[in-house]
């Protein structure tokens, strides 16, 4: 009988597709966290470029606890009177870390040779409520920081409450409107500088692309677009504008996943081109190669590193 039926016309196919894609508002997916709206673009355009030598070693003592050692040697930029001038001084740092991983608890601590202490905590109180805490303790007066986040994940929305030092209070909310579109907003108030702000954001994603935008009362406008060429190749672009300072920056980049390596690179409107290569030499041994060229300042950065463990 199926062979005797006439084939569907183009209009019938389009109508059938629209019916199949009808939005079920009672079963919308959970959106990404508000602070991760641009995560795909950041992975391609904000790679961890460095200058000099970097060596990271991690040793697992058991399935949940591990120790890490990091050595960084290279020049550090210091402020100069002219924005087009770069001043670098040679520096070296050692960092000791301890990590505790559990399905419902994450503890990370880092101690630097200059006396700084970084601590991070993430605890899943329930399947939907997560508490996060970040702290920075330094020897410098009024430079220590602390932040607490309370994240709640609903079936089709996410909400977050932020509490920090200097009477900082913030809240974010993001809601899935369709299977592909999510809308959100944020508010914050800082007691000491007497500042407040509000922002709005939108994110649209499919299997092949991700587009996101964000605007805030501080004057910041951010737009990102990522096109997934294949499972291994992604192209990304972003646009950042500040209404008050009139600063504009745009960049394009790529993210290429090879069988044993990952290559990321970008170039922006300020004339800065950068690339980062991460290659797996063997199990537990990775090689890093970083390069950055600033045509405007006539400055360059080159670094290589090893990651063990």
Curated annotation (Swiss-Prot):
Q: What is the protein's major site of localization?
A: mitochondrion
- Is Acetylation found in the keyword set? yes
Which residues in this protein are found as N-acetylmethionine? 1
List this protein's GO terms for biological process: cellular response to phosphate starvation; monoatomic ion transport; protein import into mitochondrial matrix; protein targeting to mitochondrion
Annotated positions of the N-acetylalanine modification: 2
State what induces this protein.
Answer: Up-regulated after antimycin A or rotenone treatments. Accumulates in the mitochondrial transmembrane lipoprotein (MTL) complex during phosphate (Pi) starvation.
Keyword list, A-Z:
Acetylation, Ion transport, Membrane, Mitochondrion, Mitochondrion outer membrane, Porin, Protein transport, Transmembrane, Transmembrane beta strand, Transport
Q: Which InterPro entries match?
A: Porin_dom_sf, Porin_Euk/Tom40, Tom40
Molecular function GO labels: porin activity; protein-transporting ATPase activity
Q: Superkingdom, according to UniProt? A: Eukaryota
Tissue expression, as annotated, is: Expressed in roots, flowers, young cotyledons and leaves.
* Topology with respect to the bilayer: Multi-pass membrane protein
Entry annotated with the keyword ATP-binding: no
Q: What's a single GO CC term here? A: pore complex
Q: Where in the cell is it found?
A: Mitochondrion outer membrane
Its biological purpose is as follows:
Central component of the receptor complex responsible for the recognition and translocation of cytosolically synthesized mitochondrial preproteins. Together with TOM22 functions as the transit peptide receptor at the surface of the mitochondrion outer membrane and facilitates the movement of preproteins into the translocation pore. Directly involved in the pore formation.
Subunit annotation = Forms part of the preprotein translocase complex of the outer mitochondrial membrane (TOM complex) which consists of at least 6 different proteins (TOM5, TOM6, TOM7, TOM20, TOM22/TOM9 and TOM40). Present in a large lipid-enriched complex called mitochondrial transmembrane lipoprotein (MTL) complex made of proteins located in the two mitochondrial membranes, including the TOM complex and the core components of the MICOS complex and containing at least digalactosyldiacylglycerol (DGDG). Binds to MIC60.
Say which family it is in.
Belongs to the Tom40 family.
Please give the name of this protein: Mitochondrial import receptor subunit TOM40-1
